[in-house]
Regions:
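Cell wall/extracellular polymer interaction/catalysis modules
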Residues: 55-217, 228-240
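Conserved "landmark" site that anchors the functional core of diverse proteins
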Residues: 224
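Secretory targeting and sorting signals
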Residues: 15, 20, 24-54
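Charge-dense polyanion-binding interfaces
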Residues: 242-245
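Low-complexity, intrinsically disordered or signal/transmembrane-proximal segments
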Residues: 4-5, 15
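Short cysteine clusters
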Residues: 220
Length: 245
């Protein structure tokens, strides 16, 4: 929502399995996960926690069994900070911190609503990824879009991805309708946030984590494309985004 197979990894060694010959060597396994977190943060160019130091993040009680979390906390206005977290054998560890992101032009709001230009607070699933660019890899389903891809804000298809020629679409594709064409620069890469999964009209549609154009969004979370690609490569099914002021 702009203003107007081998497991791929975000950072090498982030996901590590115990060496088969040393399955009971818990110390070695924890060491490797910790090293992976530090290496990941270095590659991203951001700060990380000391090796092996588990922390208690603000969202811990709200994300259930999730092991990957994108934490987005407001820094005022339409800007926020994203931290990338992984739950390991010793608890939660940040694998990337202090990533600057843009949120809604009106900041954040307790609940999503069409047209309020605010990013909804809460915890949301990260359902699948899409973009105008080829699939960068990762654990999420990825859809490469063309000019025939839309996110509908109308009728029975409200808050769903649709594929149709503009002249053949059964929903209003005009910008005034709220429907979005998904073949635009801000959607070079994007991740679908599970906002309003019940698809109740008026309760919000088309909330994504997507490539930034350098300005505030209509309610999405936007960041630089290089970092977003790394995140997409790292994400696995079950990951969530947690948003707060």
């Amino acid at each position: 929502m702009p203003t107007y197979q081998r497991r791929r990894r975000l950072w090498p060694n982030l996901y590590l399995t115990p060496v088969e010959a040393s399955r009971n060597d818990e110390g070695m396994r924890r060491f490797r996960v910790s090293v992976g977190a530090v290496v990941g943060a270095v590659l991203l160019g951001v700060a990380s926690a000391p090796p092996g130091v588990a922390q208690t993040p603000w969202f811990e009680a709200t994300v259930g069994n999730a092991t990957q979390v994108l934490s987005v906390v407001s820094t005022g206005g339409s800007t926020a900070k994203m931290d990338v977290w992984q739950r390991g054998p010793t608890g939660w560890e940040p694998v990337g911190t202090g990533i600057g992101v843009h949120v809604g032009a009106n900041g954040m709001a307790p609940q999503a609503h069409d047209g309020n230009m605010a990013t909804p607070m809460g915890v949301y699933s990260l359902d699948f990824a899409f973009g105008t660019k080829p699939n960068p890899g990762g654990g999420l389903t990825y859809v490469q879009t063309t000019p025939d891809y839309w996110w509908s804000s109308q009728g029975p298809t409200y808050n769903t991805m649709q594929v149709c020629k503009k002249a053949d679409c059964t929903f209003d594709t005009s910008p005034a309708s709220g429907t979005e064409n998904l073949y635009i620069p801000q959607y070079a890469h994007a991740i679908v946030m599970g906002v309003n999964k019940e698809r109740i009209p008026g309760n919000g549609a088309a909330f994504f984590v997507h490539t930034t154009d350098g300005g505030p969004t209509a309610g999405c979370v936007a960041l630089d494309d290089d970092t977003l690609v790394k995140i997409i490569r790292w994400l696995q099914p079950g990951a969530v985004i947690a948003i707060a002021q």
